[in-house]
Structures are given as C-alpha cells and as structure tokens.
C-alpha cells in the first residue's frame, strides 16, 4: 500500500519529511512544489497560502497527482490538506485511492454535502474556534465510507511548527498510523 502525505499550509517541512520517512510514505503533496517555505509562524503561512495558492488550486494539485496513481494508495492529510482530501473524495476520476486519514480538517465544515467514494477517517481536535466539533462529527459520521474520531488535542497537534504541537499526541498518532495506515 502506498502512503501519500498531503501537507497543511506550512508545506513540505523537514519535520514532515521525517514523518514521511517514519511512515514509509512515497510521496508528499504540498502547495509549494516541494519548496520549504520556512514560514516563521502560522499567520505568515496562512497569509502566503491564501494569497498565492488557495483551496481550489491546492485541490487541483492533489487531483492531478491522484489521477496518476497506478496502485492502491492511502492519503494522509493535515489541516488544509485534510480538507482538500475530503473534497477530492467525491471525485469519481480518482481511481486508486482506497482510503484517507484526515487530521483536523477544519474547512470540511464548508463541504458537508460531500459523499466520499472511498473510506475516509476524520480525526477531529477536541475543539475548534469556528464551529462545534461534536456537531460536525455527529453529522458526518452518518455518511457512508466515513468514520470519525475526536481526540483530546488541539488543531495542529501533529505539526512541529504549530503553536498547538503536542509531542505526546504526535507520538501516539504516529504509532496509530503505523498500525492503521498500511
């Protein structure tokens, strides 16, 4: 099984490269064509992403990559990467993705009508500022091909560069991914 990581707004960072090695992921999809942008903080990363890439262009990057996949693959996405995976999951031109694991995809709340064509595991943080996590989790868990989990950590807990990074949570979820992503 191929594992493909789909990054958040920070893009391809040294920490994400390390995660890809730990999971034996063959591909990292990011919005900046593989360039480490070395953002100083989340505000800078968000501003740059919104001004220079945006949701739809990042979705197009992922769609183009997934259309070239020739063997069964699992997508693992973080934040905006998780949200674009969610949106992609309803596209019937995507043939060789059989599973996705999406960490804290907060923009999923704007695409509640999506009906995934492959299995999607949504991992929600304990809370989000812009919406009720439990309400969204309950709504989406009723859909076919969707499983939801709410963890006791904040949005960004897997990202070393996030103010909400949590080493314990990162290690816990890394171990879970090693068992469940392949």
Model regions and ranges:
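Serine-hydrolase catalytic machinery in alpha/beta-hydrolase-like enzymes
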Residues: 1-70
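Short alpha-helix in the alpha/beta-hydrolase fold that links the catalytic acid
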Residues: 18-19, 131-140
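Short beta-strand immediately N-terminal to the catalytic nucleophile in serine-hydrolase-like folds
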Residues: 72-77, 103
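Gly/Ala-rich beta-loop-alpha elbow adjacent to hydrolase catalytic centers
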Residues: 76-85
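Short, conserved loop/helix-junction motifs that constitute active-site signature segments
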Residues: 94-95, 111-118, 140-143
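A conserved short beta-strand
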Residues: 94-106
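Short beta-strand/loop motif that positions the catalytic acidic residue
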Residues: 121-124
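C-terminal catalytic histidine-bearing segment of alpha/beta-hydrolase fold enzymes
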Residues: 146-182
